[in-house]
Amino acid sequence: MKSKRAKGALASGLGLVALTATYLTVPWEGVENKAYWDSLGKVWTVCAGETKGVKKGDYYSDAKCLQMLQTRLENDFHKPLQKCIATFDAAPISIQASMLDLSYNIGTGAACSSSAAKRMREKNWPAACNAMTLFNRAGGRVVEGLKKRREYGDAQRIGELELCLAGLK
């Protein structure tokens, strides 16, 4: 059974980057307007997981955080995914959004060399969705938050697999 909330997200009419930011990246990353030290990643972080050029003491408004995220999603993640996965634009938007969020979280190099990317190149959409769930570990251990993000989410947030599968016929 397809998720009603994921179908609702897909029916919102948002473009790829806005859909990804609104329903996946921001809910899972959260928004911190003031830079903080990410002890796991060992890097200064701000907004919705932004690390590029962030320094201690940086502060951004909510509007600036959203603008920065959408710019990064488009330029640093969407465009590279289009280059490394020739069939990216042929995939349903639900798969594109899930892969874009995965790439933002794990990096384009890992996303482009993943089994999910391989399945997308084969146009095996259901297998691509399921392959994204493999990225649920940090430090060699399954992390409950990553497991939920990759799969069916939680009470407040849509998971990548949940959205991914909702767009398949």
Task: Walk through the language-model features, giving the residues of each.
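Long, amphipathic alpha-helical surface segments
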Residues: 1-34, 41, 50, 54, ...
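Short hydrophobic-aromatic micro-motifs
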Residues: 45-47
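Active-site nucleophile-His-acid catalytic modules used for acyl/amide transfer and hydrolysis
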Residues: 76-114
